[in-house]
């Protein structure tokens, strides 16, 4: 079973929180492919992650944030602040 802090766990957590079955993603992915993602057997491309996120009606970064924080609010705040600092330091 994947750790609570992983993309497979975040996918499953978000899907269940939305009350969706794996079959609900049939327009963007097969049930078997989604199952392999949730079990950590494959990694999605950014395009596939975006398509899955659209079905979940969340931003792809939300899934990534859940992947790194497990949904812990303090960790979400800390990671958001870090990302803001790092982007600012790039001086784009």
What are these regions (language model features)?
Residues 1-17:
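A short, Lys/Arg-rich alpha-helix, primarily the initiator
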Residues 10, 19-21, 45-48, 59:
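Residues that mark the N-terminal boundary/hinge immediately upstream of a DNA-recognition element
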Residues 18-39:
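Short alpha-helical DNA-recognition segment
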Residues 41-54:
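Short, basic-rich loop-to-helix N-cap that marks the start of a DNA-contacting helix
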Residues 65-92:
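Short, charged recognition helix plus adjacent turn
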